[in-house]
Amino acid sequence: MHPPHTHNINSKKGMRTYLRTHGTIAEIIMWRLLKSRQIHGVKFRRQFSIDNYILDFYCPELRLCIELDGAPHFTEMGRLQDKCRTKDLLAIHNIQTLRFENDMVLKYTEWVRSKVLEAVSLCKLDGSIEDLVINPYILD
């Protein structure tokens, strides 16, 4: 007996397609950085669903998720949902999550790219991004 299929299930296809075609400017910029294996030759997928979650960007090879956060993520409820989602992805699927605010992608694109490169390198090296420090306040 096969385990239940949890990745890119058909019931989420319409929402994935909608999110791909109605993405934020930050998502468009991030996709330009990630697509075509530009980051250490690894493949990222855009709007990839796992269980009830749709991940902004996902690298199956490294089990690495990149999420871009806009205004809804800055509320108390948004922060709580993000924390639960990150915890679930790690506990259930062994997927690590790297988060950036949309504004960081817009204002500090090269810095964000360097952090993604660093995360991918860490994942390839020992499988963990636990020690990766993302501190946007050093940029101002």
Map each language-model feature to its residues.
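Basic, amphipathic alpha-helical patches used to engage nucleic acids or provide basic targeting signals
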Residues: 19, 28-29, 46-122
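Solvent-exposed, charged helical/coil patches
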Residues: 1-41, 124-140
